[in-house]
Amino acid sequence: MKIDYIIVGLGLAGIALVEELTRRNRSFLVFEDESQSSSLVAGGMYNPVVLKRFNPVWKGAEQLQEALPHYKRLEEKFNATYDRKMDILRIFKSIEEQNNWFSACDKPRLKSFLQPTIEDNPYAEVKAEFRMGRVKGTGRVDVRELVSDYRDYLEGQGLLIRESFSYDDLELNDEEPQSQLKYKGHKAQRIVFCEGNGVSENPYFNWLPLEGTKGELITIYAPELS
């Protein structure tokens, strides 16, 4: 089987790559064993503002310009809802934070995301003595549902193989880098690894000085909080 690309891994990065290759009429085959779960455990929250000190996320606006239409196309493709848009309310801890908020609202890269008002606390159960500020253009992507739907979709088309990728079975021609590579009877022009943190086990890239990062997701039970 001759194809343009072999893709290893199908999380958010792999899905984005597959969508781009499809638009460019390139052929591909994906290998995915679900051993890397970064996308599946991700909270899926997108927010272009660093709320600790009210600074813009690096290229946050530019990233949203690419990401939001991408997720919209996926929703249309599967007749599903993955992008759940919701504002963020930032609780102020002091008068100084309120003043810093207004200063941030005047910054060109933040003014479209920060509402230039102070809001009353609508929740009696939440302690917010110095009130709140509203961040717009934020939301949460249901990553687990999206990845599951996309894997089933590719598998149904015969474009996804659910098995671990064996690096030892990959044949490269070092003398002719532009020639086809081979893998278990498949021939491809290129291979792209979308393994996330799994790249640390990849013999071609495990020399890179990468360090995994972790976040925290706190689930609370508050039945009386509307």
Predicted regions, residues:
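Conserved Rossmann-like nucleotide-cofactor binding loop
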Residues: 13, 36, 198
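Short beta-strand/turn micro-motifs composed of small residues
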Residues: 9, 32, 92
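Flavin (FAD/FMN) cofactor-binding and adjacent substrate-gating region
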Residues: 73, 77-161, 168-173
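N-terminal Rossmann-like FAD-binding beta1-loop-alpha1 element of flavoenzymes
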Residues: 3-29
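Conserved FAD-binding subdomain of flavin-dependent enzymes
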Residues: 20-23, 33-86, 99
